[in-house]
Amino acid sequence: MKLSRKFLFVAVAVILSVSTLAMTAVYAIGGVSTCNNNLNMTATSFVIFDDVGEVSISFVGYTGITTEAIVESKIQKKTLFWWSDVDNGETDNTWVDHFYKVSGDVTHTLEITKKGTYRAVVTYTVKGTGGADDVIDEVVEFVYK
């Protein structure tokens, strides 16, 4: 019994030390980040102020590589456990923006008069000569009181 307890203690100590080394290596190189073929960065913000919801979207690609971006965005409201689209007058309640340049930004606004939890759902599809299309999904929640 003493031998198995000692063995278990040593095994746990080795596992913990190895996992700590792996985490140290990741933090030493500045963390882990994804690499995209045609897209450098995106920025999405969503706020509601004075009964107006505002979704701000921007992206930056790579000069000489990025050729086109399609950005789809919508606002959804949470009811109990489910999310439902807020009517913005567009097909499928989705704003669709096309860009034929390396970077772009757009802001959409919508009247929101009911209090509750809302979110902006944004999908960036960025095309270019760097490889397969980059598809980035971002969700930003906001509680309107």
Regions found by a protein language model. Give the residues of each.
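Bacterial N-terminal signal peptides
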Residues: 11-20
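Surface-exposed, short loops/turns at beta-strand junctions within beta-sandwich domains
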Residues: 102, 109-117
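Short beta-strand elements
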Residues: 128-145
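Sec-dependent signal peptide cleavage junction
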Residues: 21-37
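Solvent-exposed serine/threonine-rich low-complexity stretches and specific carbohydrate-binding patches
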Residues: 84-100
